[in-house]
Amino acid sequence: MAETKIIVLDDGPTGLQTVHSCLLLTRWDQDTLRAALLDDSPLFFVLTNTRGMNAARAATVTREVCRNLNLTLTNLAAQGLHFNPIFVSRLDSTLRSHYPVEIDVINEDLGGATGFDAHFLIPAFFEGGRVLAVASST
């Protein structure tokens, strides 16, 4: 049976200040990704730090992470170790990040033949006390 693993690509360190009990990767070579996939934690973060890059460089880095993830998952499956990955892209905001560039790359490289069914924009960082609020017009 395939093990579910949540894999979060994070564009910057801001939100990572609130995570615990999981791996935080600052490298994404196949050996490091393999170790993270085989770790007991149900999730891990890959800090891409793409927020500070231009869009073209952010796309290149994201593609490198995705391709290494794909290769690592394929190699593990060939060894009988199957995963049901759930991919999450945690972008700081649509104003400071490279949306939809990074999402498009993730979809192209990890979305399979049909791509992902949907992506969700959630304008909140509950742990940091940030939630988008809409003012009423009353």
Where in this protein do the model-derived segments appear?
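Globin-like tetrapyrrole-binding proteins
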Residues: 11
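Cap/lid and interdomain-hinge subdomains that line or gate substrate/regulatory clefts
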Residues: 2-6, 17-20, 32-44, 53-87, ...
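Active-site regions of enzymes building and remodeling cell-envelope glycoconjugates
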Residues: 22-25
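Active-site-adjacent helix-turn-beta-strand microarchitecture at beta-sheet edges
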Residues: 14
